[in-house]
Amino acid sequence: HYKFFIIEDRKFSDIGNTFKNQYLNGPFKIKDNSDMITAHGIAGEGIVKTFSEINTNKNKGLLMVYEMSSKNNLISSNYKNNIMKYVVNYNKDIVGLITQKRDLGPDSILFMTPGVNIKNNNDSNDQKYRTPEDAIIRDNCDIIIVGRGIYNNSEPQKTVEIYKFLAWKAYKNKTLSM
């Protein structure tokens, strides 16, 4: 058996019933083939409530989009306040936040951050990047999410090892300075 989690990074963002049909009945069998899923709170509490009702054994996790790494995104402080309310009210289901930095929130959830790249600061698609060190030490996130920094590289396997090394080094430096 493998020792990793499968995250369906679909960023669900619809009403509860539509989400339920996609999660339970879609062709990709998301409920059976993933350990965690990502979702936006833009449609309100319905998606979180529905996930909680479906997740009866509490063996699946919900990662809520809290902030985005794209320039000029429309996430507001009101949106973020509501996400934090969901984190408190659905603490057995929401296991983490997709965010740019650790904000106020319980220590029991993971702060996962996209937009990590060691070669670029931004791209032509309005993506803002930062280094693993900045994401982990300065922004106090737990887990980095690297996409294009790996799959746009000619040696992706070697590149994964570099990111792994840099992230672990940053994590150790952060914990030593606490």
Walk through the language-model features, giving the residues of each.
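Conserved, mostly hydrophobic/aromatic
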Residues: D9, I37, A135, G147, ...
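Glycine-rich beta-strand-to-loop/alpha-helix junction loops that act as flexible
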Residues: P114, V146-G149
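A short pocket-lining beta-strand/turn micro-motif at the edge of beta-sheets
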Residues: I109, N140-V146
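Conserved active-site and cofactor/substrate-binding residues in soluble primary-metabolism enzymes
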Residues: G46, N82, Q127-R130, S154, ...
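Catalytic cores of alpha/beta
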Residues: N17, N21-G26, N120-N140, K158-Y163
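Chitinase-like catalytic core of GlcNAc-active glycosidases
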Residues: H1-F4
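C-terminal helical cap(s) of enzyme catalytic domains, especially alpha/beta-barrels
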Residues: D134-R138, I150-M178
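Conserved anion-binding
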Residues: I6, R10-M112, I118-N121
